Structure formats: structure tokens, C-alpha cells
Amino acid sequence: MGSLPSRRKSLPSPSLSSSVQGQGPVTMEAERSKATAVALGSFPAGGPAELSLRLGEPLTIVSEDGDWWTVLSEVSGREYNIPSVHVAKVSHGWLYEGLSREKAEELLLLPGNPGGAFLIRESQTRRGSYSLSVRLSRPASWDRIRHYRIHCLDNGWLYISPRLTFPSLQALVDHYSELADDICCLLKEPCVLQRAGPLPGKDIPLPVTVQRTPLNWKELDSSLLFSEAATGEESLLSEGLRESLSFYISLNDEAVSLDDA
């Protein structure tokens, strides 16, 4: 089983674990105290029609207290206390912790993500296992998301295709950013977080209202509604509604005639 090192120089990431960077983890309290995360869905706050967070919104984790975390929105600057299931941790832009396959697809299909946008997510059921998710653009059809399981050898090396192995996730990303060996397309850029735009529920258009007519339909002579003179802009009824009412009245008249017979 061969290995093919990437020609691209890896960016320094001192806080990455050994499986990501290929070396032992380095303790950095500053990095740990300011963890980056992303919202996994719209979360209500304040009222039924108000949404404080939206899918893909970047967050900073302030504190983790069991199932409830305190997060700071990088869009609004507001702080929220939300269930941890609504949040996924993100490190160096593309490695997600606590992200399901379905949510990965939702994030990658958000506006702003081009073909080749990608992320790597840690398995929620197999600790230490990872999957690569990539957005594939298709000009003649809808974009779709392709998923690739990243296998781990006994010596810690990783691979998608058995013929290519890598010492770390960073090396894997670097290689597939240059060559689309056995995957759908080149890895172009990490999944884009939604840093701009209105929050859901903030700029919802006002509902359409229908004013009550001042006419008293009980006292109105029906002959005025269907006369030739009542057509055009001065008509109380549209042409379509007039035809529907005429048909309804004719059905009622036929029913009355049958009853009388």
C-alpha cells in the first residue's frame, strides 16, 4: 500500500491532534477557551416568530455546562444559552465534531458554497473515525453531496483509497486539494460559514390582508352582479368569480327543480 505525500505546504495548526497533524497534541489554553463552532439549525429565542440563530452561523463557545452551552454569535455579537445538540465544534475550518451526515449535507448546500466545498466530520458512533463530505456541482442538475469514509490503519495512517495512505488528515486534505484521485472533484475550500445576511424571522414580509367589503351582500340585487353593464373595472366581481357564481347558482336552480318534480 503506497503513500503519496502532498506537494502543498501545510498551514501551521498547533492545536490539532495527532490524527490531524501527524504529531502529538499540544496543550494551548487560549485555543481551548475560545473554541469555534457552528449552529446546526435555527434556534428560537424571545418569541415564537423570532429566531436568534440560523443554520451555518459561526459561533464562539464561551462555556460548556453539560447539555447546555453558552455561545457567542459572530454575526450578531449576542450571547445565547442553547442545547449542545444544536452546535458542532469546528477546528481549522474543515474538521467538525458532533456533526451528522444529514447536517453536513445541509451546511454544504447553503448559498456561498461552490462545487468542491468540503468538510471532514468525526463519526458520532465510531470514535476516532472520520468521513469526508464534498459538494459536487452538476451544471445540468442539482448539486449533490458525496461522502467518503476515511479508514485508519493499525499504524495510524489514513486512507480513502487503499492505494494512497496519509500520515494525517491535513496531509489527506492537501493531497486531494491538488489531485482528485478516486473522489468526485478537487477539494477547493472548506465549507463556508454564514457570516452575513438577515437572520430568519427578522425580515419576513408583512402578511397579505384582505379588507372586508362594505357591501351588504344580503341586500344586493344579484341581477346587478351578472348584468352586461356590470363588467369591466366598475364591476363588483372579477370575470372568473362571476362565472363561478353563475355556475353555482345554476346548479342550485337545477337541484330545486328536481326537488319540485
Swiss-Prot record:
Ranges for region SLA C-terminal: 195-261
Function: Adapter protein, which negatively regulates T-cell receptor (TCR) signaling. Inhibits T-cell antigen-receptor induced activation of nuclear factor of activated T-cells. May act by linking signaling proteins such as ZAP70 with CBL, leading to a CBL dependent degradation of signaling proteins.
Signal peptide positions (record): none
Positions where lipid (N-myristoyl glycine) attaches: 2
SH2 domain: residues covered: 94-191
Listed CDD domains: SH2_SLAP, SH3_SLAP2
Post-translational modification: Phosphorylated by CSF1R.
Protein name as annotated: Src-like-adapter 2
Highest taxon of source: Eukaryota
Biased composition (Basic residues): 1-10
Lineage: Eukaryota, Metazoa, Chordata, Craniata, Vertebrata
GO terms assigned for molecular function: signaling adaptor activity
Domain SH3: 32-92
Subunit structure: Interacts (via SH2 domain) with ZAP70 (phosphorylated) and CD3Z (phosphorylated). Interacts (via SH2 domain) with CSF1R (phosphorylated). Interacts (via its C-terminal domain) with CBL (phosphorylated).
Keyword Lipoprotein: yes
Domain comment as written in the entry: The loss of the C-terminal domain partially abolishes the inhibitory function, but can be partially compensated by higher level of protein expression.
Region (Disordered): 1-31
GO BP, sorted A to Z: antigen receptor-mediated signaling pathway; B cell mediated immunity; negative regulation of calcium-mediated signaling; negative regulation of T cell receptor signaling pathway; negative regulation of transcription by RNA polymerase II; regulation of immune response; T cell activation
PANTHER family tied to this protein: PROTEIN ENHANCER OF SEVENLESS 2B
Gene3D superfamilies: SH2 domain (3.30.505.10), SH3 Domains (2.30.30.40)
SUPFAM superfamilies reported for this sequence: SH2 domain, SH3-domain
Keywords: Cell membrane, Cytoplasm, Cytoplasmic vesicle, Lipoprotein, Membrane, Myristate, Phosphoprotein, SH2 domain, SH3 domain
Compartments, as annotated in UniProt: Cytoplasm
Tissue expression notes: Predominantly expressed in immune system, with highest levels in peripheral blood leukocytes. Expressed in spleen, thymus and lymph nodes. Expressed in T-cells as well as in monocytes, and at low level in B-cells. Also detected in placenta, prostate, skin, retina and colon.
Annotated InterPro entries: Grb2-like, SH2, SH2_dom_sf, SH3-like_dom_sf, SH3_domain, SLAP_SH2
GO cellular component, one term: late endosome
Pfam family, one: SH2
